[in-house]
Amino acid sequence: LDPAGPAGTYNDGGQLNGEFEGGPVQKADFQELTGRFGFDWKLGDFGPTDDTMLYAFISRGYKGGGINPPQSAGLVTVKNTFDPEFINAFEVGTKSTLFGGAGQMNLAAFYYDYKGYQISSIVNRSSINENVDAKVAGFEAEFYWQMTNNFRVDTTLGLLSAKLKDQSLLDTYDQTGGDPNWLIVKDAATTQNCVASAAGVQALLAATAGTALEGTPALICNPTALNATLATYLGQATADALTPALAPNGIPTDVSDNFLPRAPETTLSVGAQYEMELGKNWSTILRGDFYYQADMYSRIFNLEADKIDSWQNANASLSFSNEGAGLEVELYVKNLLEDDQITSQYLTDASSGLYTNVFLLEPRQFGIRIGKTW
């Protein structure tokens, strides 16, 4: 570039000449009144145990919206701002002391009504936020029992139903929405995909008699650049009443009643430990833990590619401690079952090839920890 170019241009050394004029300043203001109302009641003689508490709460929650990263012209349209998230939450439960104080049981049921639930996706290599409406209902149970002076068990159970309400959204992984009348075309200039009518594209290819038509994908994906010939063929059909034969973003997919991301219907954990005195201020604890998680989806579109299979994990440890000396030694094993299960994943956008980045359970590990306190 010419080093003496106008203000706002770069020279060949990468230095900016003069002042750079950025785009318009984006502003957003969000505010809401929130609150929480509830009660708790110790049942006494009316409860299943002498120490049982019943509680119930109603609350109104709020999380402010924000501003999405700017997008280049000609790419998938993204709203400049995303809306606030609102939640009306209802919860009832009990807390009970069992076995004369040797045990504890907590039970809770809840229902969350979300308006504008904020979800993230990747567009043009940037993380953007969108809003959906959702309903979440669930049940949780916690149980602990010191069965003897040396042995205790604890367990938790979670049951969850987290689904979207009636709505349609654009899936960047399936921009045609499964409609065979539309094709995905990649614009080499922007590396983004767009959607054009199958009939229009086939007519265009037939009109060129198989010869190369330079810049065709870019022209298809940027309808304002279409010349008369291209417009004639691509204009044969429209998507969502858009012209020419183009739905730049794609065909929305019905996600009504789909599961929310990373919301398994069942989770379960079980743990047990045995503690024993060894003499001379030394004690030892042997502990084992097991965790199970049901199937879930990584995206709200609930495709087979979004599914994360159920998985389980087990850990074990053996520790020795001397309280008087402030010394502790622990031997442990993580991922005892040596399971290579995927625990989470996310999908990128078309500019990076729509690849999926996955996160695996860490491989089996053996280790020793030594601690000293003064």
Regions found by a protein language model. Give the residues of each.
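Signature of Gram-negative outer-membrane beta-barrel scaffolds
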Residues: 1-49
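Hydrophobic, lipid-facing positions within transmembrane beta-strands of outer-membrane proteins
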Residues: 33-39, 78, 88-92, 137-141, ...
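Membrane-embedded beta-barrel scaffold of Gram-negative outer-membrane proteins
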Residues: 42, 53-63, 81-168
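Short loop/turn motifs that connect adjacent beta-strands in outer-membrane beta-barrel proteins
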Residues: 44-52, 99-102, 150, 277-284, ...
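Transmembrane beta-strands of outer-membrane beta-barrel pores
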Residues: 58-64, 71, 98, 109-115, ...
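Gram-negative outer-membrane beta-barrel transporters
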Residues: 111-113, 130-300, 371
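C-terminal beta-signal and adjacent terminal beta-strands/loops
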Residues: 162, 289-299, 320-374
